[in-house]
Amino acid sequence: MLLLLSAGLWTPGTAQFAGSFNGSAGTDLSGSWSPLPHEESTGNPAIAEYFGVPITEGARAWGLAWDPSRLTLPEHQCQVHVAPYIFGGPLNLRIWEDKDPQSQTVIAIRQYISTYEQNRTIWMDGRSHPSPNAPHTWMGFSTGKWEGGGLTVYTTHLKQGELRRNGLPESDQAALIEHFIRHGDYMTHVSIVNDPVYLTEPFVRTQVFRLVLSEGLNWLYPCESVVEIANRPPGKVPHYLPGENPFVSEFADKHHITVGAALGGAETMYPEFQLKLKKAAVATITPRNTAAANK
């Protein structure tokens, strides 16, 4: 817990990180890993389901303007997921170490992510992050260090991408903190996103991976864009104008909560918000019960 809280205070402007970058002090994470997607269904979330996400008004407006048909555009069909998001979907993950041939200390930890065939480098040699004006990529620029036997990774220089699969955005100013913690044949991946544009507080997620010893995993992602919607006018981008999204209340109605709660914000992350929902439910139900009793 202390590890998460201290890591969550890191901001994108941080150029150096405290602690030793001794590449030989941690648990070996090498191997092929497959996700256990039990924490968040890859088919979720629903449109206008922002409950529990500390988004800004700008992120909410972006999300409500988003139309799922946008994913059918040829330029979006093969668009790579950014590092904070890519671990949440179906993938196979391979991890290995690059070591100095003389000292055998770890210079970098490499990751190959099968989704969109992404190669990621986590530098372990103590180097600084580059200038904010350096190129931004889908995987960003990552440095790592061992903490308590686990690997902590700091990533900047990310392109703008998705925070969740319902249109919530993540800006190119976002920074990612990760903890890779191995427990035998299982590995917990904790990700913490700080985004000064679209988040008011850090957004924390976890995924669990299982070590795969057998062959047969699919490591390729031969994506090729095609025309999915016939006769779409050239240059048309599916979207909703402010106030015109017809699905704003769909998730809220299905789960019997207020639209305001479904639209998220930092307040909705905390247990205290449950009391507010219960009070709202009582206020809604009580008049009906009273009217029925008077008949």
Identify the function of each model-found stretch:
Residues 1-8:
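Bacterial N-terminal signal peptides
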Residues 13-295:
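PEST-like low-complexity, intrinsically disordered acidic/proline/serine-rich tracts
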